[in-house]
Amino acid sequence: MTDVKQFLVVVLAVFTALSWVWANLGDNGDKIEDSYGQIIERHLLDDGAVSVLYHKDRYFYFVIFADRRSVLERYSHVKGTDLSEKEITRFLKANAGGATWAPDDKSKERRFKRSDHKAEATYANMAGRPTLTVRPLHTER
């Protein structure tokens, strides 16, 4: 019985750690910085928002913060190569917010809509670099 308890403790610890590995849309700057690594550039935008480019492992993470919360995130490879389907799925899942993502095939570029209609994603070439962009959809209530 002790082995089973130890195994369960290890599994629980791994899942708890993994829940903090990925930051996502709406997270604060501290969590994003802990997850996305070294800051390469930081710019204050005209509207008061802040754009930050991070580098960690083989990825660039570009994030726009408004009121200290992430309102747009872009993911790309440092080498400028395409993200794999697995990588795209992983980034979308990190930004699911409890919802699911589905392809939106009404456009020439690859688009994804979140099932709760609170965010959208596009995978397109930006400045010569294949990039996944995730942003909230602002709906009126």
Which positions does each model-derived feature cover?
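Cleaved targeting-peptide boundary
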Residues: 20-31
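Bacterial N-terminal signal peptides
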Residues: 7-19
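Intrinsic disorder/low-complexity segments enriched in polar/small residues
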Residues: 6-7, 141
